[in-house]
From Swiss-Prot:
Keywords: ATP-binding, Cell cycle, Cell division, Cell shape, Cell wall biogenesis/degradation, Cytoplasm, Ligase, Nucleotide-binding, Peptidoglycan synthesis. It catalyses: UDP-N-acetyl-alpha-D-muramoyl-L-alanine + D-glutamate + ATP = UDP-N-acetyl-alpha-D-muramoyl-L-alanyl-D-glutamate + ADP + phosphate + H(+). It holds the Pfam family Mur_ligase_C. ATP binds at G118, T119, N120, G121, K122, T123, T124. Its main location: cytoplasm. This is UDP-N-acetylmuramoylalanine--D-glutamate ligase. It comes from Staphylococcus aureus (strain MW2).
Length: 449
């Protein structure tokens, strides 16, 4: 870890606890800052609070007193806290310095960074890059939105390691100096409009990933979205991926993945399922080539890596029916990919947090949907969608109830697909929890012998 002294003896307010706020507070204390943590929830019974207080960190919970800003000129904001929250809104008005936990990870580490963002595919790309590093003798440590707090991992890496960091639009907002050596934008579509208010704001948040890059760095992006992704701020060397044509970067031609005219692998030898994953694979391969991962390790990974939990995850078979957990599909594009992945009749479990989206764009992908079981805040919207297409629609209270109701309508060879097209926060704390509940309920219905 770098001996960063820029925060020594400074008063710093961490807004929002959770995992990233907890680790950020501990790191700030280690860097010599005077730390206060604030969370709108009552944390009086939280074990983490006692741990922080034992380190001399003050914790104020249950509300956001604006007086906390009087003596704390530096704010570290948890990515899940919107800028519209009163204390952050007031900090902006006062012109206070607002950092992110991801920014801290950059300030304390000399390790080069591969940063991955995008509306869809970023977790798959990040995981695949990590697997390719694992198959080599190089070290690539996963961090960020994938579940490993960036500022914690950054304290553990060597300067010769790579930090492989998944970044959400929330984490990219507010970065100042953060500079990945290799940045990947998988794609940009409409998402998180409840947080960003409009599509332009969301797109601009994603573009933050390359704002500090120089000519010595790389941006990897989808060739067919280059007009959306690129801007005047872009200084890095841009390389593209495409499944449709030859590009300056990496592409598929005659059934092979090709880089600089060299065939790397036949696409028939890939294990990761789904046409949409070809783009994810191309992005990961190109990043690893640039990072110096041997081609043999890349091929070893591509012929063994089968995917990640909660992303079109095969859960199991009950009689003749296969169940798939796609709980990470928190927007319509991800669900389009899921619905497009099966030729069998589908019982589609969908619904969740209402972000103001309409779902008519899913209609062209519903041909194989035989029935829908809908739940969550968007239950009525999905019921209306299903009825408009002549589908059988059943309403459920939640994911567990949805799996129960599936048993009443299921027919031989139906695929049962949880692909909510919505975030989980109306009923579950995370999409992982939602997916685990689906799996638990599936197992509860397995016959006992």
């Amino acid at each position: 870890m770098l001996n960063y002294t820029g925060l020594e003896n400074k008063n710093v307010l961490v807004v929002g606890l959770a995992k990233s706020g907890y680790e950020a507070a501990k790191l700030l204390s280690k860097l010599g800052a005077n730390v206060t943590v604030n969370d709108g929830k009552d944390l009086s019974q939280d074990a983490h609070v006692k741990d922080l207080e034992s380190m001399g960190i003050s914790v104020v919970s249950g509300s956001h007193p604006l007086t906390l800003l009087d003596n704390n000129p530096i704010i570290v904001k948890n990515p899940g806290i919107p800028y519209t929250v009163s204390i952050i809104d007031e900090a902006v008005k006062r012109g206070l310095k607002i950092l992110t936990e991801v920014e801290l990870s950059y300030l304390i580490s000399e390790a080069p960074i591969i940063a991955v963002t995008g509306t869809n595919g970023k977790t798959t790309v990040t995981s695949l890059i990590g697997d390719m590093f694992k198959k080599s003798r190089l070290t690539g440590r996963l961090s960020g939105n994938i579940g490993y707090v960036a500022s914690k991992v950054a304290q553990e890496v060597k300067p010769t390691d790579y930090l492989v960091t998944e970044l959400s639009s929330f984490q990219l907002l507010g970065i100042e100096k953060y500079k990945p050596h290799i940045a990947i934008i998988t794609n940009i579509y409409s998402a998180h409009l409840d947080y960003h208010e409009n599509l332009e704001n969301y797109q601009n948040a994603k573009k933050q990933i390359y704002k500090n890059q120089t000519e010595e760095d790389y941006l990897i992006c989808n060739y067919h979205q280059r007009q959306v992704i690129e801007s005047e701020e872009l200084k890095a060397k841009t390389l593209y991926f495409s499944t449709q044509q030859e590009v300056d970067g990496i592409y598929i031609k005659d059934g092979f993945i090709i880089y600089k005219g060299v065939r790397i692998i036949n696409t028939e030898d890939l294990v990761l399922p789904g046409e949409h994953n070809l783009e994810n694979i191309l992005a990961a391969v190109l990043a690893c080539i640039l990072a110096g991962v041997p081609i043999k390790a890349i091929i070893d990974s591509l012929t063994t890596f089968s995917g990640i939990e909660h992303r079109l995850q095969y859960v199991g078979t009950n009689r003749t029916n296969k169940y798939y957990n796609d709980s990470k599909a928190t927007n319509t594009l991800a669900t389009q990919f899921a619905l497009n992945s099966f030729n069998q009749p589908i019982i589609w479990l969908c619904g969740g947090l209402d972000r103001g989206n309409e779902f008519d764009e899913l209609i062209p992908y519903m041909e194989n949907v035989r029935a829908m079981v809908v739940f969550g805040q968007t239950k009525a919207k999905f019921a209306k969608l299903g009825n408009s297409q002549g589908k059988s629609v059943i309403e459920a209270n939640n994911v567990e109830d949805a799996v129960d109701k599936v048993q009443d309508i299921i027919e031989p060879n139906d695929v049962v697909l949880l692909s909510p097209a919505c975030a989980s926060w109306d009923q579950y704390s995370t999409f992982e929890e939602r997916g685990e509940k689906f799996i638990e309920r599936f197992r509860a219905h397995l016959p006992s012998y």
